[in-house]
Curated annotation (Swiss-Prot):
The lineage of its organism: Bacteria, Pseudomonadati, Pseudomonadota, Gammaproteobacteria, Pseudomonadales. Its EC number is 3.1.-.-. Its cofactor is Zn(2+). This is Endoribonuclease YbeY. The keyword DNA repair does not apply.
Amino acid sequence: MLELDLQIATEAPAPTEAEFRQWCELALRQRTADSEMTIRLVDEDEGRELNHTWRHKDYATNVLSFPAEVPDEFLDIPLLGDLVICVAVVEREATEQGKELKAHWAHLVIHGCLHLLGYDHIDDEEAEEMEALERELLAELGYPDPYADDETETSPTVTTKDSE
């Protein structure tokens, strides 16, 4: 079971809690243990501030991933971590990239959840493994390959607080 804490700190429209839960549970289904995570939806100001604090980048990014650093034995339910999603950036990217907004949301949530599970895209081999899993999961939802039309970028700009 997934315990999802959805925090909405923006007035911008966003997917429903049920949609976020569906995308997270799909990405996390390989994990058999109960899990807890937070998704915080933010505006560009908060997104920029967090990106600056954790990555020293002075702009809002689409998703920041913060894997939990608390050993599971200290918790009732294992804490996976937090995703912080900047709604305006997600909307802008979907428009600029000609992608269906729901498909882009699903992709970024799945991508962020995979980061919480330890997946990364620092080198080509890791990126290929992560992207293949993203494609597979998105196809199950009926969404197209998010990388099909993008030969130059191998991964969304989802970042973890540890990656620089």
